[in-house]
Amino acid sequence: MSEERKLELPNDVEIASQTNSRDLVIISIPKMGKGSILGSFTSKYNALVFDLEKGGYEFIDARKISIYPTQDTTLGEAYGNYVKYRNLLLEQKGKYDYLIIDGLSDLDLMSSIGGTYLFMESVMGKTFNRSGGEKLKYGDKGFVLVENFLKDGGGYRWTREWFMQQIEIFKQIAPYRLFAAHISDKLIRDSQKDEVMGSEISLTGKLKTIFASKVTSLAKLIADGDKRYLNFEVMNDSIIAGSRNPKLTGKILISEKDKNGNIITHWDKIYN
């Protein structure tokens, strides 16, 4: 039995030593070059792209795994591939310093399946999605998603729980995580105007706020000609951006094209 650690109260101010964000979320509209920028990251750092989007990285050089090996892969098959890859990464946790999850909307989509299985394992759902005493699987005749079964949005509790469980699992796999996500428009209040258009993470319901509160830094990928910036500026009450890391503020150049049209990335401005 190990000796119990003695707790002591501090007398001095502790200087913060952490300089890199453990969780970085990059949000953008489609076709902004986010995949190419993240793919380039894997050539410079010990990183892996966990591609959850069908065809997301088929034209991008990267250290990557995809849950959609072909265009014919179904959502049910992709979910099975996701679980197998996730478990393999857990078995070899620490193999990569950085895990890139692209994208969050696809993980949210799979949460309908994962959340249903989670409910089926609960006391409340012990008879749900059964036939002859056997558990049904997604795609089987008679299989019902939990959000379509529980009334008044009760099913979303289970999909949210499964989603956040995956986020905690990713923390076990690698010390640093990068998440790619799409944006959706949001009408927000402004002190000068009644309503203005802002942006937020494209996730279901309360999940966008819950997830955003759990990560270190959020940035919106913006364009200026051939240059791409990570914008950490917080506008109004939008949850699109912000960072607990004092190093990540304002707009930071993340990529640009050289005279030959090659993309040059500047990840050293984000990670030491």
Region locations from a protein language model:
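Conserved GTP-binding G-domain of TRAFAC-class P-loop NTPases and closely related GTPase folds
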Residues: D185-N272
